Regions:
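A general structural motif
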Residues: 1-2, 24-27, 64-66, 114, ...
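Short, solvent-exposed secondary-structure boundary motifs
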Residues: 93-105, 200-204
Length: 223
């Protein structure tokens, strides 16, 4: 495998359509989660966001081995009933929960390919030490979604919570001490215009798709 297309937080936007255009020229497509709950200032209706989500589910079903759908904090709020994220869609809650429930087998919380680890918000050492003290990063990547659910709603003060660090769906990019056994790729923290790409991790939540070349390690935007 050499090229992975990455679609960060969608929130009802259409930029992910680039993945449909390029599906035959990449080896894998990884969505980083957060498909719904659009931002009001972007003038995307909640119903339009649901339609985009339905298209993404169809895209996954049409390309089951090539498309990876990760769960974000907004998605987990509908999937696991442990609280609501900002802009939670109470009006269409039943429909959204049914979509997730019917298709939950299509989603996961992390994806690893070689030396690259994809999650919605990234893995910090503090989170592993505090909430999964018996697990290092290698053992973490053996855990199932069901096993990880109890530890997802850890939110730090940077996101309005009272935990010392956020989970893999809640960690803010400002939370340091990133686990660096694998090169981490995540979204969650919306950035103004440019991604943050370091030699240890990349935060790509800038409303566009990216292409990762596994052979060279280069990450570039393609939208």
């Amino acid at each position: 495998m050499s090229k992975i297309l990455i679609a960060p937080d969608v929130h009802g936007r259409k930029f992910w359509h680039k993945a449909k255009e390029m599906i035959d020229s990449v080896d894998k497509v990884v969505f980083l989660g957060d498909y719904l709950d659009p931002y009001p200032l972007e003038h995307i209706s909640r119903l339009d966001a649901i339609k985009e989500f339905e298209e993404i589910i169809k895209f996954k079903n049409d390309n089951p081995d090539k498309v990876v759908l990760l769960l974000g904090n907004h998605d987990c709020a509908y999937c696991f009933d442990f609280g609501s994220a900002s802009r939670y869609d109470y009006e269409n809650e039943s429909e959204i929960k049914a979509l997730f429930s019917t298709n939950i087998r299509l989603f996961r919380l992390y994806f690893r390919e070689g030396n690259y680890l994809f999650t919605h918000a990234g893995v910090t050492r503090d989170w592993l030490r505090t909430y999964l003290p018996e697990y290092d990063i290698e053992r973490f990547t053996t855990l199932t979604t069901r096993e990880l659910v109890p530890f997802l709603w850890n939110v730090s003060y940077l996101r309005g919570g009272d935990n010392n660090t956020g989970s893999i769906v809640w960690s803010d990019v400002r939370e340091g001490d990133r686990e660096d056994t694998y090169y981490q790729i995540f979204g969650h923290t919306q950035l103004e215009s440019k991604p943050i790409i370091t030699d240890k991790w990349a935060c790509l939540d800038v409303r566009k798709c990216f292409l990762l070349d596994i052979d060279t390690g280069k990450i570039e935007d393609i939208c």
